[in-house]
Amino acid sequence: MQSLRQNNLSAQIFHEVRPFFREGPRKLGSFENKLSLVHGKNYLQNHLVVYKYSMEIFPKIVVVAGPTASGKSDLALRLAQEFDGELICSDSMQVYRQMDIGTAKPTPDVQKIVPHHQLDLIDPDESYSAGKYARDASSIIEKVAARKRLPILVGGTGLYYRALMYGISKIPSIPEKHRKKVTGWHSEHGTNYCWKELQKLDPEGAVRLHPNDTARILRSLEVVLSTGTTLAEFQHDKPFAEAKYSFHAVALEWERDVLYERINQRTHIMLESGWITEVEKLLTRYSPELKPLQAIGYREVIQHLQNKLEWGAMVEEIQKRTRQYAKRQMTWFRKENNIGWHKPDDIDEILDKIKVYLEK
């Protein structure tokens, strides 16, 4: 099995060598005599050997990205069956045990069809970061490739995708004075006040967050107050200018109205499949204030169980928040220029392009 150290080395080689393939022809054309041209040719050939070595060590990956309810899981399953692959899930909610229906986690029967990784890693009262995901997923990619199978990354958590492919900048530790300041704001004035303060300091960040998303609002305030830099700027900063892996990324592009209707229908299906019972069981063990239980859908179901939301209002709120989330996902992934967007019925085209990519 190829070691992680080798993979890290090949990533470094890959990033060092790629510029030579961009600049090589121009530089060769600038040589003034034959001897210089020979030296230049040898120089480029040597780097080509190193580049080839790095790519042999570093496995190819297929990525299935895009917004919620767009059919990522079904497409990824089809690709895994077609290309002898294993699925590496990239969803920040599917890492939680006991949270299955509301996270649209693949069912046990589906998981038996092809191997799935990065599911059911922690309990709802535990934490899991994008950095930890990147390390764990890298290790799994290495093992899947060693089995001569295709690693297929599937999910809609853009930060996980970016952390794995490009790395993420480490956010400096938050000084206690800033943490106390933000906590004091929240204790004295509440979440809505903090959200309005975030609108002043980080307008773009505030727009992306629900006004009741206490944990993320406070975190965003801590970061911008202590560093002068928004949380999004840290998340979008790429330590690696080029991706750490060779990958081919696809996403399914639906008409917005159609996608929104899929979201609405899926909400009903989840509720009919026992989502209420799932949440009731969670509440026997965990506080409703836990971050995962404040996620889209779970919070609304809890409010319904607490008689704070009638059934119809609960359904509408889940649908609305999910549509808003899908819109944010679309915005995120649209900024990733290396994702190929396809119509839902273009499956044959997707398969053909992946075949070409894998045969290179």
Each model region followed by its residue ranges:
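Residues in and immediately flanking transmembrane alpha helices
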Residues: 12-15, 20, 36, 85, ...
